[in-house]
Amino acid sequence: SCMAQKLKALENEVRNTFGSNCTIQTGAAGTSLALTIPYARTGLELKKEARMHGMSLLILEENAATITILLSCSSITTDDFAPACQLLSRLLNK
């Protein structure tokens, strides 16, 4: 399906951007993925910064060392996968 290809493209982009220090889980519906990545600050800060760049983030889980973010194929167009991942990477590594 078109959505499956889109999800694969998103997953590849996330892997290219974040490398081996991230965990990716595909959502049950096959339209989204959960990205777990080391992050020391609060999810609220991340959401605020992302919003300033026009990106709305859905945070699934937060603990002391990592954060899990939901990335949805339906809310990001394929052309935007790379810029979205780059932006996220910049925000996470601030």
Label each residue range with its predicted role.
Residues 6, 41-42:
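Residue-level preference for nonpolar/small residues embedded in alpha-helices
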Residues 34-39, 56-91:
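Conserved PLP-binding active-site segment of the aspartate aminotransferase-like
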